[in-house]
Curated annotation (Swiss-Prot):
May protect the nitrogenase Fe-Mo protein from oxidative damage. NCBIfam families: PRK00810.1 (NF002009). Keywords: Nitrogen fixation. One of its GO terms (biological process) is nitrogen fixation. It comes from the Bacteria. HAMAP family: NifW (MF_00529). This is Nitrogenase-stabilizing/protective protein NifW. Homotrimer; associates with NifD. Belongs to the NifW family.
Amino acid sequence: MRSCFAESRAIDVTDILARLKSLSAAEEFFAVLGISYDPRVLNVSRLHILKRMGQYLAEEDFAGLPDGVIAARARATLERAYEDFATSSPLTHRVFKVLKEHDPDKPATRDHTFVPFESILRRFGTE
C-alpha cells in the first residue's frame, strides 16, 4: 500500500481554509494540500474521502491559529481520511446516510415492513 503522504510537498498556506472552500474536485484538494494519492483509491472513494475530511475538519477549532498550523491540520485530516479508505472499502465506514441506513449487518427494524416480491406476484396470479 502506498501512503498518500509519502511524497508530500510544500504548499502555500495563505488563507488555506478559504481556498479549500472554493475547491470542488477531490484532485484539487490533494494538489492544494500537497498530498500525493493513488488514482485507483480516489476513483472509488473520492466522495467518501471528502466527506470524512469534512467530518474531521468539523472537529477542529481553528480560531486564532496561524495559517501554517491550519494548513498542517487540514493536510493531516485529508491524509487521515484518505488512509481510512485506502485500507478499507467505503462500505466499511458508511459515511453517507444511505449507507448507514442500509447496513446488512444490522437487524431489520420493525418500523419498516418487508413485503417479498413473490407475494406481490401471487396476488396478481403471476408466478
